[in-house]
């Protein structure tokens, strides 16, 4: 498979960026999207050119590190699929693929496609935890939790913090991320003692980090 790539290149947060055209050939349909970028970077290195910087770690859809806007869609065309789990069989030979970083004031570009998402860390540090000692695993069954409540908390805890919700939102709001983290802990008995304080502090941290406000558009949910 031969592909044409239009990739955002930017040296640093304060430098001016631009799209640069590349092409890659002999890409397997079974290759992942990041493996395709690896192939491009190997080619660039062999030409003594600077490889494209992009975030990645586990490549298993778990860690939340991968963060690419592919053809205008955070994580690409496949729903409920992270960039690292996207495979090239979803593209056609000869396609032109536009690749850019998350776009948000709170997520400044570090280099090329890599962005600084430490604003999420600040939200978590403000209240995304339970300060009371909750005991060891042996003690967990001492507090019965209805299955419906446990399921709700687990659904919220499934957020991997990738930031696609922010990238999709026209306001660059982090309310889906913040709401998930608040809901996760506030749903459980161990977290209820601090739920009001937690909610206020985490929303304040979100606002202070420079995220926009939520206007109930729903773009965040569609890419989560």
Which residue stretches match the model-derived regions?
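Eukaryote-biased recognition of intrinsically disordered, low-complexity regulatory segments
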Residues: 1-23
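Short, contiguous acidic and Ser/Thr-rich linear segments
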Residues: 20-32
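Short beta-strand segments
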Residues: 18-22, 82, 97
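Ferredoxin-type iron-sulfur electron-transfer modules in oxidoreductases and energy-metabolism complexes
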Residues: 31-50, 97-223
